[in-house]
Amino acid sequence: MAKVFYNGDINEGVLQGKTVAIIGYGSQGHAHAQNLRDSGQEVIVGLRPGKSWDKAAEDGFQVYSVREAASRADVIMILLPDEHQPTVYKNEIEPELSEGKTLAFAHGFNVHFNQIVPPATVDVFLAAPKGPGHLVRRTYVDGAGVPGLVAVYQDATGQAKDIALAYSKMNGSARAGVIETTFQEETETDLFGEQAVLCGGTSALVKAGFETLVEAGYQPEVAYFECLHELKLIVDLMYEGGLEYMRYSISDTAQWGDFQAGPRVVTAETKQAMKDILSDIQTGKFAKGWILENQANRPEFTAINEREKNHPLEVVGRELREMMPFVKAKSKGVVGSAKN
C-alpha cells in the first residue's frame, strides 16, 4: 500500500528561516507561490522579463531574474515547461547551487531522463499536486487541498524528505494527503496516463467515433454531440465516484451497452499497444524522440498540430460552441499542469 502523509505527520519547521524561489509563474507557479506565502513561508519569484513578471509583482512578490532568485534562495522549485527547464537550469540555476541547497520539481521528466543532472551536494525532491494550478490555489483558500505526490531523488543533507513534506504541507496538499513515490514512478505513470488514456487515447477514441458516424451518413453536428460534447458528463461522474457511480447514474440501456461494446472497442490488441507505449516510456524511447523534436524546432509537432486543428470534428465543434455561451474554453495547464 502507498504511504500517505497528512498535516499532523509533518513538521514544517524545517523550512523556517529559509527562502523558497518559485521559478515560473504560470498555472502551477502562481498557486505554489501564493499558497506557500499564505502559509508563512518566505517566497520570491524567478522569471524572465514579461507578462508573468508584471503579474507576480502585482501579486506582491519580490521578482528577480532566475539566476538572482536561485542565488538568494535555499529551496529552488522549478515550475517551467519541461522543454525549457534544461537550458534555464544549466545557464541560470546550476551556477548558484551551492552546497546544502535544495532543488525541487513538480514533474520528474528532466531528472529521470538525465536532462538535468544536479550536483551531489544538493537535495533534490519532487512535490506534485495532482490538479491544475487554479484548483491547487482555490482549494487552499477554501481550507482544503489537492492530494499530491512527494519523492526524493537525492538526499545530501539528510533532510530532503522532511523539506519535501513541509513544502507539500505549506502548499495545501497534506490537508488531503501526500503519497510517497519515486521520480521514476511519477514520470513514467504520468507520461503513460497522458499518452494512452487522458490525451492520446481519448482524443483518438473521440475522433474515431465521430468519423464512424459521419461516414455512415449521420450529421456531423449530431456526431459531435454524441462523441465529444457529452464526454464531459460521463467523465464528471467518473471523477466524482469512479466507474461504479457513473454506471449507477446512466440508464440501464447505456450501462448494458457499456458492458457489451466496451471490450469490443478496447481489445486485447489495444491493451498490448498500451504495453508497447509503456515500454517506449520506460526505455527512454519516447523521451529521446521528444528531446530531438524540440532540438529540431518541432517540425513534426507543428505539422500534426496544424492538421488536427482542421479536422472536421474541430470545424463543426467551433461552430456548435458558438451556440453554447455557457461553454468556455479554459486556459492551458490541466493535464501536465506541473509543467507550466
From Swiss-Prot:
The KARI C-terminal knotted domain, residue ranges: 182-327
Cofactor entry: Mg(2+)
Active-site positions on this chain: 107
Binding sites annotated in the UniProt record for Mg(2+) 2: 190, 226, 230
Catalytic activity: (2R)-2,3-dihydroxy-3-methylbutanoate + NADP(+) = (2S)-2-acetolactate + NADPH + H(+); (2R,3R)-2,3-dihydroxy-3-methylpentanoate + NADP(+) = (S)-2-ethyl-2-hydroxy-3-oxobutanoate + NADPH + H(+)
GO molecular function: ketol-acid reductoisomerase activity; magnesium ion binding; NADP binding
UniProt KW Signal keyword: no
Disulfide bridge positions per record: none
Binding site for substrate: 251
Binding site residues for NADP(+): 25-28, 48, 52, 82-85, 133
Enzyme class (EC, first level): oxidoreductase
Annotated pathway: Amino-acid biosynthesis; L-isoleucine biosynthesis; L-isoleucine from 2-oxobutanoate: step 2/4; Amino-acid biosynthesis; L-valine biosynthesis; L-valine from pyruvate: step 2/4
Cofactor remark: Binds 2 magnesium ions per subunit.
EC numbers: 1.1.1.86
Keywords: Amino-acid biosynthesis, Branched-chain amino acid biosynthesis, Magnesium, Metal-binding, NADP, Oxidoreductase
Binding locations of Mg(2+) 1: 190, 194
Keyword flag Lipid biosynthesis: no
Residues of the KARI N-terminal Rossmann domain: 2-181
CC per GO annotation: cytosol
GO biological process terms held by the UniProt record: isoleucine biosynthetic process; L-valine biosynthetic process
Family: Belongs to the ketol-acid reductoisomerase family.
General function of this protein: Involved in the biosynthesis of branched-chain amino acids (BCAA). Catalyzes an alkyl-migration followed by a ketol-acid reduction of (S)-2-acetolactate (S2AL) to yield (R)-2,3-dihydroxy-isovalerate. In the isomerase reaction, S2AL is rearranged via a Mg-dependent methyl migration to produce 3-hydroxy-3-methyl-2-ketobutyrate (HMKB). In the reductase reaction, this 2-ketoacid undergoes a metal-dependent reduction by NADPH to yield (R)-2,3-dihydroxy-isovalerate.
Listed name of the protein: Ketol-acid reductoisomerase (NADP(+))
Species of provenance: Halalkalibacterium halodurans (strain ATCC BAA-125 / DSM 18197 / FERM 7344 / JCM 9153 / C-125) (Bacillus halodurans)
